[in-house]
């Protein structure tokens, strides 16, 4: 039975189907007649395992008429590839660079009882590290677009509701770091944020909110 590409790429997406039928969907997309593709070289610098993300990204790009060629860093080698470079990445000459990091890549998170000054120093150290990544990439590949994830909230909050109040709370630290990422994006060309924080929240909120219940009974949650 042929795949219904229009249905597959109409929101809301069937995530299970996209994951299970990646190869079949890719073949069907490339077999479309009369489709002219724009070729793009995309480097994915990984802070975690990104194979499935890369594969699904390829499907959506192909559906949009973009045929990607990928460079993928080794696991958790995003910093080394960005700051020190390597010959394979240089030869690839990426047009788009995705720095795919998340909360697990924060190296020095606040700990219980850290003073305001210590927390600020930890924030500044993280920003210095990421700014170094962005500036090195921009200098080495000046025509490339850089896309950086911001940080989603940590799954566990050891301080409960105080996690967003105390300066050493992880939630407050992530919010501070995300604001700094946004400030950098607002003042630098060819640099864009991917709102991983918002995406994670929407996935969570989709399980929290029931629109039918609100429309029918005004239950807000």
Q: How should each PLM-predicted stretch be described?
A:
Residues 1, 10, 14-17, 45, ...:
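Non-membrane alpha-helical secondary structure
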Residues 2-4, 30-39, 56-58, 63-73, ...:
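Alpha-helical cap/lid subdomain in secreted, periplasmic
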Residues 2-36:
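Short N-terminal or domain-adjacent regulatory/targeting segments
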Residues 12-14, 76-79:
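Compositionally biased, intrinsically disordered low-complexity regions enriched in proline and serine
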Residues 39-55:
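Catalytic nucleophile-elbow at a beta strand-turn-alpha helix junction centered on a G-D-S/GDSL motif
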């Amino acid at each position: 039975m042929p795949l219904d590409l229009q249905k597959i790429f109409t929101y809301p997406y069937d995530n299970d189907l996209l994951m299970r039928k990646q190869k079949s969907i890719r073949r069907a997309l490339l077999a479309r007649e009369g489709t002219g593709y724009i070729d793009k070289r995309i480097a994915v610098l990984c802070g975690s395992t990104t194979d499935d993300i890369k594969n699904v990204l390829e499907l959506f790009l192909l559906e949009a008429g973009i045929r990607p060629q990928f460079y993928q860093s080794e696991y958790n080698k995003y910093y080394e590839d960005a700051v020190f470079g390597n010959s394979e990445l240089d030869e690839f000459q990426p047009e788009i660079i995705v720095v795919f990091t998340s909360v697990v890549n924060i190296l020095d998170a606040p700990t219980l009882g850290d003073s305001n000054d210590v927390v600020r120093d930890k924030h500044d150290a993280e920003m210095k590290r990421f700014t170094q990544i962005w500036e090195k990439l921009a200098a080495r590949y000046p025509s490339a677009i850089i896309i950086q994830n911001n940080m989603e909230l940590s799954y566990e909050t050891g301080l409960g509701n105080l996690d967003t109040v105390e300066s050493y709370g992880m939630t407050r630290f992530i919010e501070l770091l995300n604001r700094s990422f946004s400030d950098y994006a607002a003042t630098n060309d060819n640099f864009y944020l991917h709102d991983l924080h918002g995406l994670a929240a929407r996935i969570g909120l989709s399980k929290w909110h029931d629109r039918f219940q609100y429309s029918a009974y005004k239950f807000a949650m």
